[in-house]
Amino acid sequence: MERVDHLADERNKAEFNVDDMKIVWAGSRHAFDVSNRMSRLVANDPVFEKSKRAVMSRKELFKNTLRKSVHAWKLINELRLSDEEGLKLRSFMDQPGFLDLHWGMFVPAIKGQGTEQQQQKWLSLATKMQIIGCYAQTELGHGSNVQGLETTATFDPKTDQFIIHSPTQTSSKWWPGGLGKVSTHAVIYARLITNGKDHGVHGFIVQLRSLDDHSPLPGITVGDIGMKFGNGAYNSMDNGFLMFDHFRIPRDQMLMRLSKVTREGKYVASDVPRQLVYGTMVYVRQSIVSNASTALARAVCIATRYSAVRRQFGSHDGGIETQVINYKTQQNRLFPLLASAYAFRFVGEWLKWLYTDVTKRLEASDFATLPEAHACTAGLKSMTTSATSDGIEECRKLCGGHGYLWCSGLPELFAVYVPACTYEGDNVVLQLQVARFLMKTVSQLGSGKAPSGTTAYMGRAKHLLQCSSGVRNARDWLNPGMVLEAFEARALRMAVTCANNLSKFENQEQGFSELLADLVEAATAHCQLIVVSKFIAKVEGDIEGKGVKKQLKNLCYIYALYLLHKHLGDFLSTNSVTPEQASLANQQLRSLYSQVRPNAVALVDAFDYTDQYLGSVLGRYDGNVYPKLFEEALKDPLNDSVVPDGYREYIRPLIKQRFRSAKL
């Protein structure tokens, strides 16, 4: 049967070359080729089929994840895929599982904190999957406050061993993915105690389960923490708990690149700078920002295609109804999210460069840019994951009632993504780290030390504190210099106001505590400035492809002007813009929506997502939504029979019951 493209008319409206935009989205021709090949490899492999996840029991879902994970590993080896290809294949598998933590946390922890000898021993096993590892830091009682971890590792010089112990219930490791049922080993974090002195939290490699029968080793209590949010979602992952009862490990299983304990029990810091640990943190947070763009793009793709298919109202004579995407209310909610997906993609590209730059500097013992890089990645992780989780939920609502169906793909996507707001750093706590960095930077203004990197704008504090926006008409809001100055003035003035208010407190920590909400807002303003500036830098550079640059410019200014609209209180209260200029920004925003409208479907086609990866009836490439909704409904186990189980037990007795007439 010939496939009908219900979105063909939408695609014919495009004013740019979609294939060229695909290259820009991917980052390069090579990156696109890898992504395209791996996505189609997964889409065409029946083992990776995922439409039945919603009706699986927890045990069935978990076993299904094991099957897919092992199959992915076999493919990587049989096809001799590169690390880049393997990473892409696992991402398109689209099912959280133990491989994510093994490759994403366990292996990098050993690379970053293990000595050369430790890396040779453990990585040779881990990279061949002869051991399976996880990363056990978070405890039941402590997450963000790493220094408050309670698990202890006490050195016993008599046996040359560390005694790992969980002294309280709240000291049990809680949440690590892969821990509950799969991992044979873990990098665990515990308080290092030797000769009665607590040296703080350090990392250790600990075997948890037998390599013969997978049973937990004596002294270890381990299991799954139970069902999480959503139906399938992260319930495919065995997030676990772990308690130690005076469990002994050899001394050489302490990760000793940064510090070590001698045979006699002496604690010795190595000459390797401790700041190297932050390199791994920058890498992890950079990848989280890139993943934010991917997740938001999936939701936006679904909502955009469905908004073009769905028709409601607008017909007064029995004619065809209006496409939902043509309503300005829909555009005002949808197009800023489309712009955000592209914005996060490009700031993610920049963060990859930043990670490479920081790594080179660290290897040369140059730590000058590290505080700024740490604050920047912390803030962008927080900002992008919060915006993405909110954006996915907004896309669900943009799809109306059908967005609530599991087969829309949006409830599952939201349930899988929303933990990003708390893992690898709670988003509010991370913004407070940014705020501390900003307060320090403001305090150094005028000292002769010029701010650099993402805070370079603060070096123009005198101008930015006094300037007025030069916007005179709506088109001025397409001037990159004027847009940037408005965002710079807002960010600087909010930071300076916080610093001035802090100076009124005799106790700085008390002041910081009192001003937490204001500080978070100042940090958010700074991070939004970073994203806007990197988006502008991207679209002002060389971009190949017919019409591509124009479309990206439209999205760039939609992103910036919508942020201005959303946070108008900040811009007005800091006098960064006037009410009249804000009105002109809204006028320009409406014009940009009209320019994006004919290109909307093509702009989400540029993400190059297969129907299998999207996992959405509403977001199908061909737009054939309604027949497929019926097909999905009929697949539900409740429709296996026309009369439901329980009819004779409950329904029939209920409707056949007899009531005696009341006597008057």
Swiss-Prot record:
Its EC number is 1.3.3.6. Its cofactor is FAD. Keywords: FAD, Fatty acid metabolism, Flavoprotein, Lipid metabolism, Oxidoreductase, Peroxisome. Its main location: other. InterPro entries: ACOX_C_alpha1, Acyl-CoA_ox_N, Acyl-CoA_Oxase/DH_mid-dom_sf, Acyl-CoA_oxidase, Acyl-CoA_oxidase_C, AcylCo_DH-like_C, AcylCoA_DH/ox_N_sf, AcylCoA_DH/oxidase_NM_dom_sf. It comes from the Eukaryota. FAD binds at C399, G400, G401, H402, G403, Y404. It is found in: Peroxisome. GO terms for cellular component: endoplasmic reticulum; peroxisome. The keyword Nuclease does not apply. It catalyses: a 2,3-saturated acyl-CoA + O2 = a (2E)-enoyl-CoA + H2O2. One of its GO terms (molecular function) is FAD binding. Induction: Not induced by wounding. One of its GO terms (biological process) is fatty acid beta-oxidation. A motif (Microbody targeting signal) lies at residues 662-664. Belongs to the acyl-CoA oxidase family. Catalyzes the desaturation of acyl-CoAs to 2-trans-enoyl-CoAs. This is Putative peroxisomal acyl-coenzyme A oxidase 1.2. It comes from Arabidopsis thaliana. The gene is ACX1.2.
